[in-house]
């Protein structure tokens, strides 16, 4: 008859890899259509002008331009892409 309890394995020791969420293009940065601006879970940032939102809430640029973050009075932060003026391209 054993007089010592069998040693059990630890029930801890599991962790998931980081998901690389966050802002990928900051305010004032130049983006082209399709560039990812932010990866998020839920709507920490909301899409504004010329910004689309994917099924996983990823924000992406729809046009070429500069990224702008703007806080509204209701507490929401909107991300927009301001197109570069047509005169600057000529």
Curated annotation (Swiss-Prot):
GO cellular component, one term: cytosolic large ribosomal subunit
MF annotations from Gene Ontology: structural constituent of ribosome
Keywords (A to Z) from UniProt: Ribonucleoprotein, Ribosomal protein
Membrane-traversing stretches: none
Keyword Translocase applies: no
SUPFAM superfamilies per UniProt: Ribosomal L27 protein-like
Protein name, per record: Large ribosomal subunit protein bL27
Organism: Rhodopseudomonas palustris (strain BisB5)
Taxonomic lineage of the native organism: Bacteria, Pseudomonadati, Pseudomonadota, Alphaproteobacteria, Hyphomicrobiales
């Amino acid at each position: 008859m054993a007089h010592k309890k069998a040693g059990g394995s630890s029930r801890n020791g599991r962790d998931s890899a980081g998901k690389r969420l966050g802002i990928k293009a900051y305010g004032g940065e130049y983006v082209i259509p399709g560039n990812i601006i932010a990866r998020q879970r839920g709507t920490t940032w909301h899409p504004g002008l010329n910004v689309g939102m994917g099924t996983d809430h990823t924000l992406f640029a729809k046009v070429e331009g500069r990224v702008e973050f703007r806080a509204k009075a209701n507490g929401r932060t909107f991300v927009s892409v301001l197109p570069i003026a047509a005169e600057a391209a000529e």
